[in-house]
Regions:
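Intrinsic disorder/low-complexity segments
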Residues: 1-5, 10, 22-23, 26-30
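Bacterial N-terminal signal peptides that target proteins for export
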Residues: 3-17
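Bacterial N-terminal signal peptides
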Residues: 16-26
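N-terminal soluble domains immediately following signal/targeting peptides that reside
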Residues: 30-172
Length: 172
């Protein structure tokens, strides 16, 4: 081999090696190994309202929205056009009911930060919450290992609930 063809072959080998390293590093990008959401639900007695914030990994939410919307690709960002999709999804998977009625959930909005999306809701509520059932099946149709943790603050004291596949409804 001539000197110039040897240098060319060496450059190609290095380039191939760098591309291989880049491909491997991007395909093994650090992804979380668990699927969890955390919900804070607080009763504001003077306002007679539940204030709710749900923290979900953004990539998981994007996948859940995609599966609910015929594989459409979603990219969650602040000030995007996805609020109607997020609202519809949350209304389907987060409900508060008793034997007679379903509480009206008001979607306040969402906020994206780093790797998580915060979803904000309010539920006007003037009754005693005991005996009401809260469904939190967010992302359970997408991930079999999804766990949704909820911290509930009532005037009677705090409670914590865990929701998972097969246990998506808890009695308050």
């Amino acid at each position: 081999l001539s000197s110039s063809s040897y240098k060319f072959a060496l450059k190609i080998t290095r380039l191939t090696f760098l591309l291989l390293i880049f491909w491997l590093s991007s395909s093994f990008a650090p992804m979380h190994q668990y699927h969890v959401s955390v919900t804070q639900m607080k009763y504001d007695k003077p306002a007679k309202t539940f204030e709710i914030s749900i923290r979900i990994f953004t990539d998981d939410l994007e996948k859940g929205l995609s599966e609910e919307n015929n594989k459409r690709i979603f990219t969650i960002k602040n000030n995007d056009q996805n609020n109607p999709f997020v609202e519809r999804y949350v209304r389907k998977h987060f409900t508060l009911t008793n034997a007679q009625k379903k509480a009206e959930i008001q979607y306040v909005g969402k906020e994206e930060e780093a790797d998580a999306t915060w979803i904000y809701l309010e539920i006007p509520f003037s009754e005693n919450p005991e005996g009401w059932k809260l469904q939190n099946s967010i992302l359970m149709e997408t991930f079999d290992d999804q766990v949704n943790m909820m911290n509930l603050k009532l005037p009677s004291g705090p409670k914590t609930f865990l929701y998972k596949k097969g246990q998506a409804v808890q009695t308050l």
